[in-house]
């Protein structure tokens, strides 16, 4: 008998040690997730606050709003749930309802800001001239205000009035505990059917439908522009070859042009796929479960609910993890990368960022291709004679307001346009990105007129 008690005691000790190790690992992982979310979104906020050329771009208003919502997720939502996961109970008492409201508000604000960004990018690409006239800071602030107001309305009002709680068998009941018998250290976040469906529609399903439509149309516009540019490239190469009596290479260059066009389209598709794929993979499982849980009914033949609490919690964290990835996807273009490197002091360690950089200008005034250069001036730099010359450009100019003319994007720079030279050429911004493995971004695709010329944008 004593041996049996000893065996039972050893078994309990092993279970306690295993549970303790599991909690330590969970705590380390969740702490790392919270830290990366805080770091990434704080860097975005500080960069926009510190550098005026980032504040001056209206499209960055939406990025900073997204960063603020994700920062609030990391401050007001994630730490409290992480403490509960580690301790095994809710230690914050009456703060439960406020925390639930913060959870719904911050997560909804993050998703709605992603939706607003997709609409902004689509408007900028589909109607660039109207966008330049209409998209003022006031309009941007109005769009952001609508997103935040909607987030507050579907969170604090229903939660504080207890409209969100299930009146029948709740998720907690399905796990073997009835709402009336809940201990004070348990935070019941179960939702009733009406609120679960309506809030999921506003917070996720409608925004994700809008994002799918806008990004699909963005891809089609980009595809059309890329094919037009490819046709202009082939026409220019054909004219040059006829002029130089090198017609034998036409077929080879035509095949190369088709391959380049396909490569460009593939990179655009990859960029948009990453944007939508990360968002859907993080949030879709949670919102499917969020709509299923209120319809789960207790089964008399088994003690298990249709969805376990562990499964539900895992996908809750999947959704919050999206807040740590958003800064990488939406604020990792060239402008933000330079700002981040300055804030973190990395620009002093990077060998490519010298104090003075030499940029060669050919006899047409356009910059010569040089992959080692971190800064390439626009083609408006004045010509000096008929020979190529070198301009000495201080590296500090990269951080000044003259850089406002550089294009913004999702994860790199892509500017689809033409440079008027001796003949029509693809701009270095395209060839520099598409020929390398750098990420492709879509912010502005300049429209092509009927005669094949790109219109210039006026501020």
UniProtKB/Swiss-Prot annotation:
Q: Major location, coarse class? A: membrane
Q: Which InterPro entries does the entry mention?
A: Dopamine_D1_rcpt, Dopamine_rcpt, GPCR_Rhodpsn, GPCR_Rhodpsn_7TM
- Which one Pfam family would you cite for this protein? 7tm_1
The signal peptide stretch is none
**Annotated disulfide bonds:** 96-187
What GO biological process terms does the UniProt entry carry, in alphabetical order?
A: adenylate cyclase-activating adrenergic receptor signaling pathway; positive regulation of MAPK cascade; vasodilation
The record's subcellular locations are:
Cell membrane; Cell projection, Cilium membrane
The entry annotates sugar attachment on 4
What residue ranges are annotated as transmembrane? 24-49, 61-87, 97-119, 139-164, 192-216, 270-297, 312-333
Q: Report how it sits in the membrane.
A: Multi-pass membrane protein
The reply to whether 4Fe-4S figures as a keyword in the UniProt entry is no
Its cellular-component GO annotations read: ciliary membrane; synapse
Q: Keyword Coiled coil, does the record have it?
A: no
Give me the Cytoplasmic side stretches, as residue ranges.
50-60, 120-138, 217-269, 334-459
List keywords of the entry alphabetically: Cell membrane, Cell projection, Disulfide bond, G-protein coupled receptor, Glycoprotein, Membrane, Receptor, Transducer, Transmembrane, Transmembrane helix
Give the GO molecular function terms: dopamine neurotransmitter receptor activity, coupled via Gs; G protein-coupled receptor activity
Q: Which of the residues are on side Extracellular? A: 1-23, 88-96, 165-191, 298-311
Q: What does this protein do?
A: Receptor for dopamine.
- Report the sequence similarity comment from the record: Belongs to the G-protein coupled receptor 1 family.
Q: What is this protein called?
A: D(1)-like dopamine receptor
Query: What is the protein's species of origin?
Result: Takifugu rubripes
């Amino acid at each position: 008998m004593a041996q049996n008690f000893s065996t039972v005691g050893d078994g309990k000790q092993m279970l306690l040690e295993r549970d303790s190790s599991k909690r330590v690992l969970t705590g380390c992982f969740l702490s790392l997730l919270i830290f990366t979310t805080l770091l990434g979104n704080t860097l975005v906020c500080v960069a926009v606050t510190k550098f005026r050329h980032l504040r001056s771009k209206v499209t960055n208003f939406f990025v900073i709003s997204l960063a603020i919502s994700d920062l609030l997720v990391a401050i007001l939502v994630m730490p409290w749930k992480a403490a509960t996961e580690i301790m095994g109970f809710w230690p914050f008492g009456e703060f439960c309802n406020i925390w639930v409201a913060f959870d719904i508000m911050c997560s909804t604000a993050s998703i709605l800001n992603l939706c607003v960004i997709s609409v902004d990018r689509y408007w900028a690409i589909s109607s660039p001239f109207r966008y330049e006239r209409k998209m003022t800071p006031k309009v941007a602030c109005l769009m952001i205000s609508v997103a935040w107001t909607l987030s507050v309305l579907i969170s604090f009002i229903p939660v504080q009035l207890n409209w969100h709680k299930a009146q029948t068998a709740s998720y907690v009941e399905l796990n073997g505990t009835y709402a009336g018998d809940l201990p004070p250290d348990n935070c019941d976040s179960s939702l009733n059917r009406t609120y679960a469906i309506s809030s999921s529609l506003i917070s996720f399903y409608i925004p994700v439908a809008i994002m799918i439509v806008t990004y699909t149309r963005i891809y089609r516009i980009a595809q059309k522009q890329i094919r037009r540019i490819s046709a202009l490239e082939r026409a220019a190469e054909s004219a040059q070859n006829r002029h130089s009596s090198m017609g034998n290479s036409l077929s080879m260059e035509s095949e190369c042009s088709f391959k380049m066009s396909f490569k460009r389209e593939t990179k655009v598709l990859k960029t948009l796929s990453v944007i939508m794929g990360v968002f859907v993979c993080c949030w879709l499982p949670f919102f499917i479960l969020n709509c299923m849980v209120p319809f789960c009914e207790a089964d008399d033949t088994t003690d298990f609910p249709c969805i376990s609490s562990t499964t539900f919690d895992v996908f809750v964290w999947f959704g919050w993890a999206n807040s740590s990835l958003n800064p990488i996807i939406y604020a990792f273009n060239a402008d933000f990368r330079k700002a981040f490197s300055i804030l973190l002091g990395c620009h002093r360690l990077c060998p490519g960022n010298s104090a003075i950089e030499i940029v060669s200008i050919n006899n047409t005034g356009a910059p010569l291709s040089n992959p080692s250069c971190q800064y390439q001036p626009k083609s408006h730099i004045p010509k000096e004679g008929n020979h190529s010359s070198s301009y000495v450009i201080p590296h500090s100019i990269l951080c000044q307001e003259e850089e406002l003319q550089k294009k913004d994007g999702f994860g790199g720079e892509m500017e689809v346009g033409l440079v008027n030279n001796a003949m029509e050429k693809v701009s270095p911004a395209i060839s520099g990105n598409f020929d390398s493995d750098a990420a492709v971004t879509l912010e502005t695709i300049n429209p092509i007129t009927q005669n094949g010329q790109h219109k210039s944008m006026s501020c």
